[in-house]
């Protein structure tokens, strides 16, 4: 029994296997193939402390396509909202379900859930990591760039957030060059140190830069909202600090015509990205969103096999 709290815990070949399974699931889905449910009658619990569109619905769809039922719940709907401990809650859920996908404010909550669980715990987003998003990002880049290894991608904006961190981690596992483009006060140099062993094995490279011109020649330009959930009190300061890092048509021109545009969504149009980019010919955000479903199927299949 394994968990998916962060891709840091996975070896490069394991990440690649999950992505190959994702591509296979997608190929069969697009071909209209109706395949025998892998886990008929099983239950997956979606425990969400935060709102969600793509993560909640992609996990629900993925579970259904594998023959499982997903039940969505929040702290206010469980006794955990009235003081029952996480440990006791997880011991009970372990008797009913085969997995719990949890979206939480603090990554430590996920760790406590996993420590007290006899079923798989999946990170559906925490303040530090978003591994499900990173897997969908990798599948999308693979599809459009035509290769899985050696990809060059620039994440522009809040380079300290969970999406940027998980992109860097999966990039290190797959031998990518990940350019984290944002203000110096958001640089997390410890992340590069933590990934040094994987980078040495795969030949990847991760570096921080505050120059928007460093998007030149990449395969993909990626951004995310400037004010993530939980940082609303810092909204104005973050907008001021990140305004020079808006992904607009000029940035895409620097990147080059072959570069694709990625965004994990939801987008705050007019802030981190302009309409002409997200709706433009280089944007692949809707395919990227669909890929959340296919990679979720692969994660379920990999963990529950």
From Swiss-Prot:
Top-tier EC class: transferase
Subcellular location: Cytoplasm
The entry's keywords: Amino-acid biosynthesis, Arginine biosynthesis, Cytoplasm, Transferase
Pfam families associated with the record: OTCace, OTCace_N
A GO MF term: ornithine carbamoyltransferase activity
Listed GO biological process terms: arginine biosynthetic process via ornithine; citrulline biosynthetic process; L-arginine biosynthetic process
Annotated binding of L-ornithine, by residue: 162, 224, 228-229
Binding site for carbamoyl phosphate: 52-55, 79, 103, 130-133, 264-265, 292
Function of the protein: Reversibly catalyzes the transfer of the carbamoyl group from carbamoyl phosphate (CP) to the N(epsilon) atom of ornithine (ORN) to produce L-citrulline.
Family, as annotated: Belongs to the aspartate/ornithine carbamoyltransferase superfamily. OTCase family.
Entry protein name: Ornithine carbamoyltransferase
Organism the protein comes from: Pyrobaculum islandicum (strain DSM 4184 / JCM 9189 / GEO3)
């Amino acid at each position: 029994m394994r968990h998916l709290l962060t891709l840091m815990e996975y070896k490069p070949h394991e990440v690649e296997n999950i992505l190959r399974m994702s591509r296979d699931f997608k190929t069969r889905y697009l071909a209209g193939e109706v395949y025998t449910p892998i886990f008929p009658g099983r239950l997956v619990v979606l425990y969400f402390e935060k709102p969600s569109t793509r993560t909640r619905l992609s996990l629900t769809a993925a579970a259904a396509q594998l023959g499982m039922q997903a039940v969505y719940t929040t702290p206010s709907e469980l006794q955990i909202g009235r003081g029952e401990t996480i440990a006791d809650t997880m011991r009970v859920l372990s008797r009913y379900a085969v997995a719990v996908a949890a979206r939480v404010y603090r990554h430590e909550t996920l760790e406590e859930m996993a420590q007290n669980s006899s079923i798989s715990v999946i990170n559906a987003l925490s303040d530090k990591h978003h591994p499900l998003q990173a897997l969908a990002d990798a599948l999308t880049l693979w599809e459009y760039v035509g290769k899985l290894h050696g990809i060059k991608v620039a994440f522009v904006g809040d380079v300290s957030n969970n999406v940027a961190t998980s992109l860097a981690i999966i990039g290190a596992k797959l031998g990518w060059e990940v350019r984290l483009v944002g203000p110096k006060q958001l640089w997390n140099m410890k992340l590069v140190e933590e990934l040094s062993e994987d980078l040495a094995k795969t030949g990847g490279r991760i570096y921080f830069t505050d120059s928007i011109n460093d998007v030149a020649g990449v395969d993909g330009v990626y951004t995310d909202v400037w004010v993530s959930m939980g940082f609303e009190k810092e909204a104005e300061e973050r907008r001021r600090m990140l305004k020079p890092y808006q992904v607009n048509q000029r940035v895409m021109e620097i990147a080059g015509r072959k570069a694709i545009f990625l965004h994990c969504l939801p987008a705050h149009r007019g802030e981190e990205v302009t309409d002409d980019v997200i709706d433009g010919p280089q944007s692949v955000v809707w395919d990227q969103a669909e890929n959340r479903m296919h990679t979720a199927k692969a994660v379920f299949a990999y963990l529950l096999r």
